[in-house]
C-alpha cells in the first residue's frame, strides 16, 4: 500500500517552530513502522531539516511549498495519515477525506474532540468509571475568571477550550497569575473562551487505543511525565505501564471511543488517584506514546488494519518502551554528527533553545530507568545537559 504521512511541523508548514523536534520524532517513528510492515511511504520534509542530512525512512521525500503539493500526492496514494495541532487537524483531515482513504479520526470526531467543553459533557453522560473534575467555561476576561477561581479555590488549571496537550495550559495558585494565564490561552486558541478547572492531584496516565469501523482495541496504559509548575509541559512517558484499574479503563475507553466515533490511533489522558480516575482529554490523533509503543509492538500493521477493518482481537507487547524529552542547556555547541551518533536519539534539537527526544526499550520496567540514565550520560558528556 502507498501511504502518505503528512506531519505538519516536520513538513515545514509552520516554519521553524518548537514543535519540530516532537513532530519529526513522530514522523520518523510512523515511517519506520510502516516501512517495516512492507508499505511504500511518502512524506514531506522541511528543507531546513533535509539540509542537515537528517531524513526519515521513507521511499519518497518531497519538499512542501503549498497545499497544492499535498493534494497532488493524495491523488496518487492509497491512504494518508495526517498529523497536526488540533486547531489545524480538522481542515487537513477534510482535505484527506476528499482525496483518499484516511488512517485516523474522521473530521467530525476531530471537531467534537477539539472542544473540551463538549467532550467533558459527552464523557459525563456516558462514563461509568471516569470522573470529570469540576470546571467552568468562561470568556477570555479577567473578572469572571477571578470570580470563579475565588469560588472553587486555588490552585486551578486554566486551559484553552480548543487546545491540545499542554499547549496554553497554566497551573494558577493566586489571582495575580490569572492575567498572564489568560494571555497565554489567547496566544494559542482560536476560541473566545477558556476552561477553568479545579486542580487534582494524582498520577498522570494515558490509555492508547486503535479503532476501526467495527472494533476498538485498547493497546496499553502509559505513564506520563508532566512538569507541574506555572507552564505545564509534557516530558515523556513509559509504555506499557502497570495500572490496577487497567481493565476498567480499557472498558471505559472503548465506550468513549464508540460514542465519539473515533478511528485510527488515539489517546485518552487520565489522572489516577487511588480508586478515583479523572478524565482529562481525548487526543484524536497519533500521540507521542506511539513512539514508545513502536518499540514493543507492530504499530505499522495496526495502522493499516484500521483502513482494512481487520484489527486483531488483542496485541502482544514485547517489553517496555519509553520516550523522554530533554530540555537542553542554553549556549550548547550544536553538533548534529555527534548527537546522531547516539542511536537512542530519535529527534535532535532543531534550535539552540530546543529539546531532544530519545526513545529506549527494555525487557523490564526497571531496566527502562537504566537505559534512560545511560543516554542521559551520553548527552551530558556532549555538553548538552546541565
Task: Specify the residue positions occupied by each region the protein language model found.
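ATP-grasp fold ATP-binding core
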Residues: 123, 149-171, 190-202, 207, ...
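Glycine-rich phosphate-binding loop of ATP-grasp-fold ATP-dependent ligases
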Residues: 134, 155-183, 204-208, 226-242, ...
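Peripheral (often C-terminal) accessory segments that flank ATP-dependent C-N-forming ligase machineries
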Residues: 145, 301-386
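A short glycine-rich, hydrophobically flanked beta-strand micro-motif that places a catalytic Asp/Glu
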Residues: 263-274
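Nucleotide-activated donor-dependent transferases that construct or modify glycoconjugates
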Residues: 1-19
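ATP-dependent carboxylate/phosphate-activation module, predominantly the ATP-grasp catalytic core
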Residues: 198-260, 283-307, 323
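Short catalytic helix/loop segments, enriched in acidic residues and glycine
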Residues: 15-34
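Conserved N-proximal alpha/beta basic substrate-recognition cap immediately N-terminal to
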Residues: 44-140, 147
